[in-house]
Amino acid sequence: MTIRKAEEKDIPRIIELLGQVLQIHADIRPDIFIPNTTKYTVEELTELLKNKEKPIYVAVNESDVCVGYAFCQLQKQPFSNNMVQFKTLFIDDLCVDQQARGQHIGESLFEHVKKEARKMNCYEVTLNVWSGKTSAEKFYEKMGMKTKERQMEYILDNL
């Protein structure tokens, strides 16, 4: 397995994996996510691949077929009176093909993101994860991540 930056030839496979992730989210929160959709279109992914501030890394097998990805965003904390200035590499989405799980591909992708973040002189790697005792939460904790802040919600029942 190799990890590299995503290329246009990876887009069809990335779309498939985006569908897998969306279905997991729709199962957890059917009140928010629409099943059988994806976060990005082919056109949006084509444009995203050109954005150096939003790198996409893919894990590919021996046949150069994408079996996982990490969508990232370089974020800069601007200077303010109460916070120091720093850079973060935010993992917007990380997925391993459901048929390839258990082969440490997710760990390899996560380690690659950390390595790239260091090259970019980032202070931290961050991400959001849906709560509910999911396998994703367990995975990120295993990778050494800790809760930094927590977003809470109150669903209004008058909708």
Model-derived features: where do they sit?
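A short beta-loop-alpha structural element at the N-terminal edge
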Residues: T2-E16
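Conserved GNAT-fold acetyl-CoA-binding loop/helix
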Residues: Q23-L45
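A short helix-loop-beta-strand connector motif used in the catalytic cores of GNAT acetyltransferases and
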Residues: E43-V58
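Conserved beta-strand in the GNAT
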Residues: V58, V65-L74, C95
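Conserved acetyl-CoA binding element of GNAT-fold acetyltransferases
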Residues: N82-Q98, E153
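Conserved acetyl-CoA-binding loop-helix of GNAT-fold acetyltransferases
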Residues: D93-V96, G102-K115, K142
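Conserved active-site alpha-helix within GNAT-family acetyltransferase domains
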Residues: E107, E111, K119, S131-E149
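Conserved GNAT acetyl-CoA-binding A-motif
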Residues: A117-N128
